[in-house]
């Protein structure tokens, strides 16, 4: 039994199918006990009988194992190979693994046998899986080298097996560990026909997204901003332009051509001149004013014909010429040769009416055409500036001369047309028309991007040149930049700068050593000090020296003048001079090598792209051959003729982009270093390089391994990136959708302070200087400063006030609160102290945010009375905390009880409060006792004293009515304890109750206060109005902000009117003028 099994195994290993079949058929016990899925062990690389049967292509034994003994072709050996891997290995691959059967020397027969075996493996069905399907042979199984059966079949050149694998869904794009596809494996083994067949199937493979990508490719606008024109295209373009212009002006073709030639073939320019003065336009062009045709006719019906009989003389003919050719004679004389013109001779009709014989006409026209003046041939009559029509020239000269005339005419058309230029390549008869000059603001056109100053154009034969200088194409560089780059290459001689990078690194290291280290005084080794004293010891030569003066340390003792003798100025200066010279020399060397290294960086990449461009130019020749080969190979397999022009299109896109990348490095070299413009340019340049290299890898290969739709998508992406790159350079390296620059300050510019929420520095500086000079009257008499729209207000439309909405109301409310607080704490004895404090406060800089916050917090904590409208507005304003402090950005409203709501003011309004403090401290007349005693007690009580009901309804805490200035100075003392020493404390002196003072009551601290309160009926009326408005606000919450602002404006106006009505004539007569003026100024603020 064991002997039979051993013989059978040896027959399988040696590939002797006849012996193996004889042993297997003659031993029933072996047939029953043999399992084709059991490994032979490690000595045999864990191959199974099925592996050996597939390796040698034993179709009879393989069929028996698969369908009779439940063999599994997915079993793997030690190399992770299945039976299909070994089956697809040809004789060339298996030579090194053992002896081969003699029939394997015949590869054709072996190919068919292996194809039959492969067909059996592909038809095999295993156990039933969970999904209801049966196990199949893994057609894309990979071994340890990541090879699939298709890799081995392609490398072996087994065409039948390759076709079977591809038909059953073998992966054409699978890559092994060497990143080779089955096509690459066939190419390496010189199976060219098989490689070409695999390439065609790879390129034209079907993919779900292929149709969508090809549809986008077909719809892609492939137009360029230029158009190459052949000679026939030039003639057609000229004729179309003449016909369209003649039809538009209702003029003959000859007249339209003359008009266009006189206006540089620019139809828009001609129409502009025609609309201004048609007669002058025709006179300057050398033609007569055309007669408008009758209705129902066009310009073609008005063309003169040489066969029509001559009409009467034109009115432009001179009297002398009329006398020389009288109309009553049957024959006329030629004005050149003075011979009679035969009646049998075909007449030459001219619009001017001059007669010449046909011989003179031919001689004259031949001479003009030979001289090259084909586009400005005037009538040969004396002082006649009538152009000779084209039909006259064609009817007189010979055919050869007519052909030459047409060439000169086309040449004149191109040279006089600024939008058309000839190709500068020698022997090229083509021209280029720049079809897109400038950008389209609408942005609907895909070619609406702006053109560069020196765009590159192509005549259609692959001749690229610059539109401006007619030299080598160099976009995105302009002509001057390109010239500077070529001059830079000539000066630098980069072929001699081979070791610049190494020299630059050496110079940089030398500069670093000189800057951060000192040489040892003995062995000159660089030493860097990072800790310790000035006593240094060289780690190399053990030399002790001083770090300061670099001399021996034994010189630093008490006997030599002290340890720190070297710290004297003379010694240090001497050492620094020596090191400074070395550092300056190293810096110069480093800077020079740095510039050289920078040039070599750009020059190296410039040459790399140039070399790649030269290599990829060869693809233009091979692309057509590749297209024919792919088309022929696919036609043999599928019978169709596919579109292969995408290969040539992709090569053209690659070459255009490669040329732009080559010239982009000179452009970047001359950009300003470390600028935003250069950073954006380099980012876009890198992005363009990435997509370009990706397309080059797909196209620049002997055999294409990328599907058609992926090549098309890569080419479209490169074209899109190229257009975006050029458009950005033409715009100055800025994205197309860049937003407007924010309102910020640049070098030499100014901030828009109101936009940022601050008062302008000019506004603050002017008020600070006035307060420091003590010019309080100029502050009081200059109310326009508060209303300047250019500095402290927003720009509002016409018809609205110049200041910000609600600013006047807030200022008025703040002033009234401030003045009432000052009136409570006022006393004659403390007036001078308060004035001194205010003058000291004015010496501080209100630009300091601490001052502004102090005033705001004082308003928040003072607990002063304010009406409901002002309370609602102040509670909704933005706090100064939003400008950088720790306060909240918006103050929450607080119920009106023992604590007043917080008032949030802007910086400009806080400055107005400071101005009011100065006015209150500097003006002493309104608070004189004579002024207060001159008014009756009843009037003063009605104007200044609140009723008991008002005080109870207010619910104020007596402790909240502190001095405003005291709160400011106390808070500022906590923030700046040193600066507050300059400010004298405010003295609080009690005053005795006198009968002439109005409504004096005792406070909680013994200080007598007085308040300005409106009459009771007005208070109750206003309270009712505010309650009704609050109820309406709750019903309409969306309109609360708008209504509040409108009511605040009306309340400000009504308060001014109430003040005006409160000044009765009798009171004004009894009060001095200074008091009334002061009160009016207080209320106006």
Curated annotation (Swiss-Prot):
Residues 926-959, 1068-1085 have a biased composition (Polar residues). One of its GO terms (molecular function) is ubiquitin-protein transferase activity. Residues 330-570 are annotated as: TRIAD supradomain. It catalyses: [E2 ubiquitin-conjugating enzyme]-S-ubiquitinyl-L-cysteine + [acceptor protein]-L-lysine = [E2 ubiquitin-conjugating enzyme]-L-cysteine + [acceptor protein]-N(6)-ubiquitinyl-L-lysine. Gene3D superfamilies: 1.20.120.1750, Ankyrin repeat-containing domain, Zinc/RING finger domain, C3HC4 (zinc finger). Residues 304-319 have a biased composition (Low complexity). Zn(2+) 2 binds at residues 352, 354, 379, 384. GO terms for biological process: protein ubiquitination. ANK repeats lie at residues 45-75, 145-174. Zn(2+) 4 binds at residues 520, 523, 538, 541. Zn(2+) 3 binds at residues 466, 469, 474, 479. A zinc finger (RING-type) spans 334-384, 520-549. Residues 282-322, 764-808, 884-907, 921-959, 1014-1085 are annotated as: Disordered. Residues 1018-1033 have a biased composition (Basic and acidic residues). Keywords: ANK repeat, Coiled coil, Lipoprotein, Metal-binding, Myristate, Phosphoprotein, Repeat, Transferase, Ubl conjugation pathway, Zinc, Zinc-finger. The active site is at 533. InterPro entries: Ankyrin_rpt (IPR002110), Ankyrin_rpt-contain_sf (IPR036770), Ariadne (IPR045840), E3_UB_ligase_RBR (IPR031127), IBR_dom (IPR002867), Rcat_RBR_ANKIB1 (IPR047564), RING-HC_RBR_ANKIB1 (IPR047563), TRIAD_supradom (IPR044066). Residues 846-865 form the UIM domain. Belongs to the RBR family. Members of the RBR family are atypical E3 ligases. They interact with the E2 conjugating enzyme UBE2L3 and function like HECT-type E3 enzymes: they bind E2s via the first RING domain, but require an obligate trans-thiolation step during the ubiquitin transfer, requiring a conserved cysteine residue in the second RING domain. This is Ankyrin repeat and IBR domain-containing protein 1. It comes from Mus musculus. The gene is Ankib1.
């Amino acid at each position: 039994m064991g002997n039979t099994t051993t013989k059978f195994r040896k027959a399988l290993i040696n590939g002797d199918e006849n012996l193996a079949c004889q042993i297997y058929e003659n031993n029933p016990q072996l047939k029953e006990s043999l399992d084709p899925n059991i490994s032979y062990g490690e000595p045999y690389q864990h191959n199974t009988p099925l592996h050996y049967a597939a390796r040698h292509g034993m179709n009879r034994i393989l069929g028996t194992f698969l369908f009779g003994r439940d063999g599994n072709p997915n079993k793997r050996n030690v190399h992770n190979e299945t039976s299909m891997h070994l089956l697809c290995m040809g004789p060339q691959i298996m030579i090194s693994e053992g002896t081969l059967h003699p029939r394997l020397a015949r590869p054709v027969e072996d190919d068919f046998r292996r194809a039959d075996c492969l067909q059996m493996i592909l038809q095999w069905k295993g156990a039933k899986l969970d999904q209801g399907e049966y196990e199949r042979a893994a057609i894309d199984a990979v071994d340890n080298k990541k090879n699939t059966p298709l890799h081995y079949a392609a490398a072996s050149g087994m065409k039948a097996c390759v076709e079977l694998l591809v038909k059953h869904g073998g992966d054409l794009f699978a890559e092994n560990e060497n990143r080779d596809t089955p096509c690459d494996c066939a190419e390496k083994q010189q199976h060219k026909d098989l490689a070409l067949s695999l390439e065609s199937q790879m390129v034209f493979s079907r993919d779900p997204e292929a149709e969508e990508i090809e549809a986008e490719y077909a719809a892609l606008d492939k137009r360029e901003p230029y158009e190459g024109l052949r000679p026939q295209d030039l003639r057609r373009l000229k004729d179309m332009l003449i016909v369209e212009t003649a039809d538009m002006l209702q003029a003959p073709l000859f007249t339209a051509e003359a008009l266009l030639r006189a206006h540089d073939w620019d139809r828009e320019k001609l129409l502009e001149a025609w609309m201004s003065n048609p007669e002058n336009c025709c006179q300057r062009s050398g033609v007569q004013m055309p007669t408008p045709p009758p209705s129902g006719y066009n310009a073609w019906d008005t063309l003169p014909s040489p066969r029509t009989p001559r009409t009467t003389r034109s009115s432009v003919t001179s009297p002398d010429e009329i006398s020389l050719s009288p109309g009553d004679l049957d024959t006329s004389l030629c004005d050149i040769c003075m011979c009679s013109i035969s009646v049998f001779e075909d007449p030459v009709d001219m619009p001017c009416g001059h007669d010449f014989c046909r011989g003179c006409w031919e001689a004259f026209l031949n001479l003009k055409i030979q001289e090259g003046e084909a586009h400005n041939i005037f009538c040969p009559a004396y002082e006649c500036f009538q152009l000779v029509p084209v039909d006259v020239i064609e009817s007189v000269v010979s055919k050869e001369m007519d052909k030459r005339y047409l060439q000169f005419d086309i040449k004149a058309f191109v040279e006089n047309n600024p939008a058309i230029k000839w190709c500068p390549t020698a022997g090229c008869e083509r021209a280029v028309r720049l079809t897109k000059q400038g950008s389209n603001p609408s942005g609907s056109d895909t070619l609406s991007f702006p053109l560069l100053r020196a765009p590159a154009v192509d005549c259609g034969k692959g001749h690229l040149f610059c539109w401006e200088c007619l030299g080598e194409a160099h976009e995105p560089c302009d002509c001057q930049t390109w010239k500077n780059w070529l001059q830079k290459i000539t000066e630098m001689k980069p072929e001699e700068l081979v070791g610049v990078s190494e020299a630059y690194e050496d110079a940089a290291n030398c500069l670093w050593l000189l800057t951060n280290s000192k040489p040892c005084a003995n062995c000159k080794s660089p030493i860097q000090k990072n800790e310790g004293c000035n006593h240094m010891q060289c780690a190399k030569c053990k030399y002790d020296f001083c770090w300061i003066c670099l001399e021996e340390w034994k010189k630093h003792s008490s006997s030599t003048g002290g340890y720190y003798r070297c710290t004297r100025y003379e010694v240090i200066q001497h050492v620094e001079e020596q090191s400074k010279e070395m550092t300056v020399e190293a810096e110069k060397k480093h800077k020079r090598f740095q510039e050289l290294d920078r040039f070599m960086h750009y020059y190296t990449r410039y040459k790399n792209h140039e070399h790649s461009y030269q290599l990829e130019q060869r693809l233009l020749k091979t692309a057509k051959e590749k297209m024919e080969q792919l088309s022929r190979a696919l036609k043999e397999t599928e019978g169709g003729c596919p579109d292969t022009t995408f290969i040539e299109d992709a090569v053209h896109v690659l070459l255009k982009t490669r040329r732009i990348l080559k010239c982009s490095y000179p452009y970047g070299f001359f950009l300003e270093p470390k600028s935003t413009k250069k950073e954006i340019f380099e980012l876009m340049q890198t992005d363009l390089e990435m997509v370009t290299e990706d397309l080059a890898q797909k196209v620049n290969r002997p055999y294409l391994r990328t599907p058609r739709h992926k090549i098309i998508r890569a080419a479209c992406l490169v074209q899109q990136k190229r257009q975006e790159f050029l458009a950005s350079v033409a715009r100055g390296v800025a994205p197309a959708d860049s937003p407007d620059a924010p309102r910020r300050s640049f070098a030499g510019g100014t901030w828009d302070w109101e936009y940022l929420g601050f008062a302008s520095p000019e506004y603050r500086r002017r008020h600070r200087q006035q307060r420091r000079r003590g010019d309080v009257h100029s502050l009081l008499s200059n109310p326009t400063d508060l209303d300047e729209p250019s500095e402290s207000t927003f720009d509002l439309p016409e018809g609205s006030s110049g200041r910000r909405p609600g600013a006047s109301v807030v200022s008025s409310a703040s002033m009234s609160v401030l003045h009432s607080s000052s009136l409570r704490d006022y006393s004659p004895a403390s007036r001078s102290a308060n004035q001194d404090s205010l003058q000291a406060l004015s010496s501080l800089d209100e630009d300091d945010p601490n001052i502004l916050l102090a005033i705001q917090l004082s308003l928040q904590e003072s607990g002063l009375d304010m009406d409901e409208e002002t309370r609602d507005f102040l509670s909704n304003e933005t706090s100064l905390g939003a400008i950088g402090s720790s306060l909240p950005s918006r103050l929450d409203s607080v119920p009106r009880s023992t604590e007043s709501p917080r008032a949030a003011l802007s910086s400009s309004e806080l400055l107005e409060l400071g101005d009011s403090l100065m006015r209150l401290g500097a003006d002493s007349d309104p608070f004189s006792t004579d002024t207060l005693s001159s008014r009756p007690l009843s009037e003063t009580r009605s104007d200044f004293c609140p009723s008991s009901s008002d005080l109870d309804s207010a619910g104020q805490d007596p402790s909240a009515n502190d001095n405003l200035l005291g709160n400011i100075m106390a808070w500022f003392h906590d923030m700046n304890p040193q600066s507050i020493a300059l400010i004298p404390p405010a003295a609080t002196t009690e005053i005795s109750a006198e009968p002439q003072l109005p409504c004096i009551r005792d406070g909680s601290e013994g200080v007598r206060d007085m308040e300005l309160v409106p009459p009771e009926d007005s208070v109750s009326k206003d309270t009712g109005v505010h309650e009704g408005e609050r109820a309406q606000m709750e019903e309409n919450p969306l309109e609360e902000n708008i209504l509040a602002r409108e009511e605040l404006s009306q309340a400000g106006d009504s308060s001014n009117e109430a003040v005006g009505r409160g000044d009765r004539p009798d009171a004004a007569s009894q009060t001095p003028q200074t008091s009334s003026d002061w009160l009016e100024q207080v209320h106006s603020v």
